[in-house]
Amino acid sequence: IEEAIEFGIKNAELSLAEIASNWTVNLGYGEGKGSATLITPFLRTALLAKQAQQMGQQVRREVIEKALTEDADMIVFEVLLFGGYPQFGRSVKFLLKYDKKEFMPVYTFIPSYSEMGRDYTQIVKSRVKFKKTDIPSDAKVVLWIQFNVEPEGKEKYTCEFDFDLSKYR
């Protein structure tokens, strides 16, 4: 925990994308693409320390411990997706694949409407959690995401984000 707090304070001036880059798989910008960040306990702690530093506050250990306890048995991702219409986030489906098994999320947050990015691309920021049960800490997993190209849903975009859990602290 101390190492993560130091990392967050030392890198407080970096953007979220910069500080989380080593935990992120990025498929690029544009419709049907996106990025996924694995929120490990180390990264979660570092981000809380970064936030406290930016606000000129002390890092409160009880806040960090509560946050870590909350997600202790979870694999957590923050996902950024690019779509073609304002409500595309409503069609997003998540799966975590490991060892020929598919796991459904136990928690998903996706806003009902997207934000507009440059060149009118629609952007959705979401958070998804999966139970760690039956997934070892050194597993190679795939975060599989599918969403509609257009409101009718005839065509779908599919994004696959590969994570080797053993490589993330």
Q: Model-flagged regions — what are they?
A:
Residues 1-169:
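Conserved functional micro-motifs across diverse proteins
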